[in-house]
Design a protein with these regions (language model features):
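Catalytic micro-motifs at enzyme active sites that drive phosphoryl/nucleotidyl and oxygen chemistry
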Residues: 79, 88, 110-129
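Conserved catalytic cores of phosphodiester-cleaving nucleases, focusing on short active-site segments
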Residues: 124-147
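A short acidic/basic microdomain associated with nuclease active sites
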Residues: 94-118
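C-terminal amphipathic alpha-helical segment
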Residues: 185-257
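Low-complexity, highly charged intrinsically disordered N-terminal segments
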Residues: 35-41, 65-74
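Catalytic cores of nucleic-acid endonucleases
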Residues: 142-204
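Nuclease-adjacent, charged terminal/linker segments that flank catalytic cores
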Residues: 1-58, 240-322
Length: 322
C-alpha cells in the first residue's frame, strides 16, 4: 500500500485531531532526558508552537510556512523529524483505526533495555494497538524536507521482516514518510505496508505499554494541581476530568477587551479511572488493579461527544476549545 496524497488520497483532519496526535505521539524531552514531570506542559506547548511555526493553511491544505526559510539546516531537520512522528500518529489513527501509538524507545528509557526484545534486530520506531480487535501493528516514521526515496526505503526495511508482536502477527507493518512538495510546498506523505516477516519477534509487556502511553498525559494533571490546587480540575463529562491549558499568543479580537477571554485556551480531558490509577495506584484501586483491566473496561464512545469544538480519541483522551 503506497500513495502520495496529492494524487491518490487526501486525508482530512482538523486542529483538535492534530492536537490529539501531538499529545499522544511522545514528548520532546522523552528522547533526550529522564522523566521530568515538572515540564510536561512546556513540552506540549513547545510542540504546538513548532507545528504552528512550520505549517500554514492555504485553501484547506497544509503548506510549509515561509518563515522556515530563516531556519538553519539542523533546525529544519528537527522540525521535519517531529512532523514525521506527529503525522504518522495521525495517519495511524484516522486511516488504520489504531487506538494506541507508542515510541519503542520509551521501554528502554523507563523500564530498561530488556523491556522490549526484538530478537537482535533493530526495533521499529513505533508500536500500535487496536483495542477492539486486540491487534498490534508496527510503524516506522521519517520526516524530510523533500522527497527522499532512500529514507523511505530505510524505513520500509525497518518494519520488513517482523514476524510477530507478542506472539501475534502484526495487523500492519507500515513505513511512513512526510515531506514537502518542492513545487507548491504542500505537506505530503507516502505509506508502505510491508509483508509479514519470518524471523524477528517483538516481545514486551502490555501493562508497561499502556503505562507509558498514559503516564505523561496524567502528569499534566499533576502539574495543574500544583499550580492551582483548588479549581484547576473540573468534571465536565461524567466519568472524565479535565484541565485547562494556555497556549502562546492571543486570540486577536479588537472588540474583546477581556484579557482572560483573549488568551488561547483549550481543555484536556482524561477518564477518571485512568487518572485514579496513577494518583492512587495502591489506594482505592488496590494492589491487584492493573491499568490494562481499567482500559479494557472503559466504555469509550467518541461519536457520542463529537462536535466542532470537541474531539475524543478512542483512547478516551479528549480536547475541547473554549
Amino acid at each position: 500500500m503506497e500513495w502520495p496524497f496529492y494524487s491518490s488520497q487526501i486525508i482530512e483532519t482538523n486542529n483538535l485531531e492534530l492536537l490529539h496526535a501531538i499529545l499522544t505521539c511522545g514528548m520532546p524531552n522523552q528522547f533526550v532526558s529522564p522523566w521530568h514531570h515538572e515540564k510536561r506542559t512546556q513540552e506540549f506547548i513547545s510542540k504546538i508552537s513548532m507545528v504552528e511555526n512550520t505549517l500554514i493553511v492555504n485553501d484547506g491544505y497544509l503548506l510549509k510556512s515561509p518563515t522556515t526559510e530563516f531556519l538553519d539546516a539542523s533546525e529544519k531537520s528537527v522540525n521535519s523529524y517531529y512532523l514525521g512522528l506527529i503525522f504518522t500518529k495521525l495517519f495511524s489513527m484516522k486511516e488504520f483505526q489504531v487506538d494506541y501509538f507508542l515510541h519503542t524507545t520509551l521501554f528502554e528509557q523507563v523500564y530498561g533495555k530488556d523491556a522490549l526484545i526484538c530478537n537482535g534486530r533493530k526495533k521499529p520506531a513505533f508500536v500500535g494497538y487496536q483495542k477492539e480487535s486486540k491487534s498490534w501493528s508496527i510503524w516506522e516514521s521519517t520526516g524530510k524536507r523533500d522527497m527522499a526515496p532512500k529514507a523511505l526505503d530505510d524505513a520500509y526495511n525497518q518494519v520488513l521482516g517482523i514476524k510477530s508482536v507478542n506472539d501475534e502477527s502484526p495487523e500492519y507493518a507500515i513505513a511512513c514518510m512526510t515531506y514537502f512538495d518542492t513545487k507548491h510546498g504542500e505537506l505530503q506523505g507516502i505509506m508502505r505496508n510491508a509483508s509479514v516477516g519470518k524471523k524477528a519477534n517483538m516481545i514486551f509487556d502490555k501493562e508497561q505499554f499502556l503505562n507509558l502511553y498514559y503516564r505523561h498525559i496524567c502528569e499534566l494533571f499533576d502539574e495543574s494541581l500544583r499550580r492551582k490546587p483548588f479549581d484547576s480540575v473540573i468534571d465536565y463529562i461524567d466519568g472524565y476530568l479535565e484541565i485547562e491549558l494556555e497556549l502562546f499568543g492571543l486570540n486577536v479580537d479588537a472588540s474583546d477587551k477581556d484579557d482572560y477571554l483573549r488568551r488561547r485556551r483549550l481543555k484536556l480531558g482524561v477518564p477518571k479511572d485512568i487518572l485514579g490509577f496513577f494518583q492512587y495506584n495502591h489506594g482505592r484501586y488496590g494492589n491487584n488493579q492493573t491499568l490494562t483491566s481499567i482500559v479494557e473496561a472503559l466504555d469509550v464512545n467518541p461519536a457520542e461527544y463529537q462536535e466542532d469544538n470537541f474531539f475524543m480519541g478512542r483512547d478516551g483522551i479528549y480536547f475541547r476549545i473554549i
